[in-house]
Design a protein with these regions (language model features):
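A residue-level signal for conserved active-site and pocket-lining positions in enzyme catalytic cores
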Residues: 42, 68, 117, 227, ...
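The conserved SAM/SAH-binding core of class I Rossmann-like methyltransferase domains
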Residues: 58, 176, 230
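Long, positively charged, glycine-interspersed low-complexity recognition regions
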Residues: 209-279
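Glycine/threonine-rich flexible loop motifs
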Residues: 201-207
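SAM-dependent nucleic-acid methyltransferase catalytic core
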Residues: 2-21, 26-30, 73-192, 196-201
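Short, solvent-exposed loop/turn segments at secondary-structure junctions
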Residues: 43-46, 62-64, 122-125, 178-181, ...
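Conserved S-adenosyl-L-methionine
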Residues: 20-21, 27, 31-89
Length: 279
């Protein structure tokens, strides 16, 4: 794989850092003997592109963790994924929304990571959202032919790519509160932080209140490990006061990018993203 190629993971998520991965790789300097730690691994896009030899990758979403554990230990292969998506994709094409709801109901009963992947790749906008009872509740994307051959092959290749990256590496995936990811971190380690937006009900991890965001800043300042925070600075409507109030002593590197609300070009808005790196 070429260093310039951005590895895209099989899981989709709003706010995924795919577009700024080259920026992160350019700015982050780490001790390759240390451990790469992510308390909010999400889709895993940053970890898969940094490709450290040692990593502790944590998230409160047990289904993401289970999927990557399965790929890592070989119980979920790209061929298994292909056969699963082809089989259920054919039924989806025949039955549409009713079959999507059937698969969603099954997932809410069994929590199977392959069902989670199916839903994630056929729901509305790649959203990951659970209700207060822990049930996945994102609606169908209204595309019965979602799992066309080319799309399944794309996911097949994504699973193969991340499996190849993990092979021979000392990676641990953990479903746990973010605080536990800091335990035992040393000055040789590197902690990458991509927390949720303050005040937003992030749904797959629960609400992210301001007091917890402040606690994260305190942990980041007190840990002996190196730290890099990825966070939005400002857009055309407002600025991130939390970033200015609690991370101003870090070194900031900025990059402009765009985010979309809906499909229209007029809904394309500029955003300044900051990598705040501990001095």
């Amino acid at each position: 794989m070429e260093n310039s190629k951005v590895i895209v993971p099989p899981i989709k998520c709003q706010g995924i850092k795919t577009k700024i991965v080259p920026f992160i790789k350019e700015k982050v300097e780490r001790n390759t003997d240390g451990v790469w730690i992510e308390p909010f691994v999400g889709t895993g896009v940053v970890a898969f592109n940094m490709a450290p030899q040692k990593a502790i990758l944590c998230d409160k979403n047990q289904y993401i963790i289970a999927l990557y554990q399965g790929i890592q230990n070989g119980t979920i292969t790209n061929q298994i994924v292909r056969e699963f998506l082809e089989f259920h994709g054919e039924k989806l094409e025949q039955q549409g929304a009713s079959y999507y709801k059937e698969m969603r109901d099954k997932f809410n009963q069994n929590g199977d990571p392959l069902h989670f992947l199916f839903l994630n790749r056929s729901d509305f906008n790649g959203m990951i959202r659970f209700n207060r009872h822990g049930q996945f509740n994102v609606p169908f994307c209204q595309k019965p032919n979602r799992f066309a051959k080319a799309y399944v092959t794309k996911i097949y290749n994504q699973v193969a790519n991340v499996a190849s990256i993990m092979k021979g590496k000392d990676w641990t995936f953990r479903c746990c509160p973010w605080q536990e990811a800091f335990d035992g971190a040393t000055e040789n380690d590197y902690i990458y932080l991509d927390p949720p937006y303050i005040g937003r009900d992030t749904s797959y991890v629960g609400e992210w209140p301001e007091d917890e965001a402040i606690q994260l800043a305190e942990y980041a300042h007190s840990t002996p490990a190196n730290v890099c925070l990825s966070m939005w600075k400002e857009n055309g409507f407002r600025r991130n006061d939390h970033l200015f109030g609690h991370w101003s002593d870090f070194i900031w590197y900025e990059q402009d990018h765009f985010y979309h609300i809906g499909a229209k070009e007029s809904n394309r808005h500029p955003m300044i993203e900051v990598l705040a790196i501990k001095r």
